[in-house]
From Swiss-Prot:
NCBIfam families linked: nusB (TIGR01951)
Domain of life: Bacteria
Stored InterPro entries: NusB-like_sf, NusB_fam, NusB_RsmB_TIM44
Transmembrane segments: none
GO cellular component assignments: cytosol
SUPFAM superfamilies: NusB-like (SSF48013)
Record's function text: Involved in transcription antitermination. Required for transcription of ribosomal RNA (rRNA) genes. Binds specifically to the boxA antiterminator sequence of the ribosomal RNA (rrn) operons.
Family per similarity comment: Belongs to the NusB family.
Keyword Signal applies: no
Name the record gives this protein: Transcription antitermination protein NusB
Keywords recorded for this protein, A-Z: RNA-binding, Transcription, Transcription antitermination, Transcription regulation
Amino acid sequence: MSSNKINKKSIARIAAVQAIYQNILQNNDDMDDIMQNVLSFYRNDSSITNLTGNLKISLSISHFKILVKSVFENINKLDEIIDNHLTNDKDPAHMPILLRALLRAGIYELLFYPTTPAKVVINEYTDIANDMLNGYEIGFVNSVLDTIAKEKNKIS
């Protein structure tokens, strides 16, 4: 990147995955508390500077909040969609937490953000997966999101 700046929606997506992950890990239903914890990290300049050097990072707070709240309002439907894309030999209970968090956010955006092109959503979440997951899981994220994008009209 030439500008040392990352798109605000990209950062919001990463932060949303972090909040969703934190919810699963802590089994904490207080989403407002979780969102405030994640937002406080991104608002703390010293936290960000230590991780990024001179890279400018800020997130779209509105995109973050809408995405996180909407995922939790639709969590059962999203988990059903995820579980339906597992092969018969995969137990949904054994899916890695981070993988489930990322898929929840990505699937929600594919199904309920019609103004964002599917290709953008797939690329964004595959990039996030590339930074957070292993090779098989990255391919799985790409495959599931691509399949859902193609089946979108049947699902939503």
